[in-house]
């Protein structure tokens, strides 16, 4: 058990630079694959892949800049940041926090419209370029609302600091001071933003599951697809299912800890850190989902990591083809 309120801080001081660098590297590799290894069959999907990757790069960047833990009080909440933003001002960190939350919503929306695009392709047989851009732009409406709402509320960091010190007298918060926070967690703005984020956190995965099930059925009974194309399309949809469920699964530990803390009054220090970790984790893991479930990218990775193995496979395939002819 932890002996002080900052016992996890050294670990996360190491975790965020390491996680941030790895996420940027893997996202850069993914962008290269999208640009150079996407076959013609993925032309319509590329803009959605680009969009998702870019949003996730922004997500991990804002998480690194913040490196915050969220400490809740009875009527307020403190945003305790140790990232680069803390060297500027509490206001900068608070703005960064809201941008991060909006970007987190945007990352979920990016996956949702990718699933929606696949559905429209199967229903309409073709999605026009204008429709594609409209879908991408529309996916930013809700995140933009989430971003704007907090700026209409009153920011009183001194009040948030006072209530935090009063309700958590055993905490050593000197390493964070001065810090930002919400002075009134019951304000209409706070509740509205929380409601929208909750809808996004739970509604997007559930909606994606319902839609992907319909897409898989459409693929199975599609009369103009070859079996090979059907298999590749199904593999891609399975990847989208994993992507859409990842945020939902990631939020369970931190949300469960939050419920436990609110209902029992006992603190779970790790959960204060896990809220940010779980929100940013998809930016680190999502590239691997694309590497595996998008077959051309998987083949490109294998060729790069195991060139000799791929060469042997190509040789055997060529010999088999020659023998057949």
From Swiss-Prot:
This protein's name: Serpentine receptor class delta-59
Family: Belongs to the nematode receptor-like protein srd family.
Organism, as annotated: Caenorhabditis elegans
The keyword Transmembrane is annotated on this UniProt entry: yes
Transmembrane is among the record's keywords: yes
Organism domain of life: Eukaryota
Localisation per UniProt entry: Membrane
Membrane topology (UniProt): Multi-pass membrane protein
The entry's keywords: Membrane, Transmembrane, Transmembrane helix
InterPro entries: 7TM_GPCR_serpentine_rcpt_Srd (IPR019421), Nematode_rcpt-like_delta (IPR050920)
Cellular component terms per the entry's GO annotation: membrane
Transmembrane segments: 14-34, 45-65, 75-95, 97-117, 132-152, 190-210, 235-255, 275-295
